[in-house]
């Protein structure tokens, strides 16, 4: 916990480096001088922290040495006690082992603290090296102040830098808001385009469906038209046949009426005409049959007469 706290404190005490790109030499000089002041303050704080920790480590080391001496004396007394009383040897050995473990643990702590001390010494040397490197920035800032007519004090440079930083922050915030607005408009445009694309797709599907239905209706209409034409053709054929039958029936009726000995009145109904024709044909058939029978009878009589 002490090491983590020290590291955090060191991180907080380190100077914050600003980006010096695209700024004037006077601003860079001011920034470098500010960094130099912060480095010096951080180094001084680390020196004080290092001295304080070194003193704490020394006190701990002395305390551990005293504890080690006390432990050795306790071991000596414990050995004498074992020689005087064997019945308590088991318990004494356990206590001795515990004390040995504690001594070993303390020795490990001493080693760890020694390593921390060495690390702090190395950190001190590194900070001194950084401080020595940063001194050139201090000299540079001083040289800039010597040649700059506009800024005579470091505070003026700091104020100018703060103004430029605030302006830069405002411009970045404005740019961010414009980017957010553009992204919002772009998103809304994408949503609108998607909605209209979906609507167009649905309308195209409906048009395709209606077109398919129209083609079906047209095909059905063509079928019905073909049926109608066929029906009209059949009706015309039948009408023609009916007219031919009526004319034939009327012609035959007139011929039968002219040859019949019965005075049939004139008929225009084809059915009545067919009845008359049927009767006439039936009578004619009977007459022909009777005539043939009489001829056969006569022929038979003639044959008999010749034989006799």
From Swiss-Prot:
Coiled-coil regions, chain positions: 103-134, 164-227
InterPro entries per UniProt: CFAP_domain-containing (IPR051147), DUF4200 (IPR025252)
Record localization: Cytoplasm, Cytoskeleton, Flagellum axoneme
Any one Gene Ontology cellular component term annotated for this protein: axonemal doublet microtubule
Family matches, as Pfam families: DUF4200
Transmembrane segments: none
Outcome of gene disruption: The mia2 mutants do not express the protein in the axoneme and display slightly jerky, slow swimming phenotypes, reduced flagellar beat frequencies and defective phototaxis.
Similarity field: Belongs to the CFAP73 family.
Function: As part of MIA, a complex associated with the outer doublet microtubules of the axoneme, may play a role in ciliary/flagellar motility by regulating the assembly and the activity of inner dynein arm.
PANTHER family to which the protein is assigned, alphabetical: COILED-COIL DOMAIN-CONTAINING PROTEIN 42 LIKE-2-LIKE, COILED-COIL DOMAIN-CONTAINING PROTEIN 42 LIKE-2-LIKE-RELATED
Protein name: Cilia- and flagella-associated protein 73
The encoding gene: FAP73
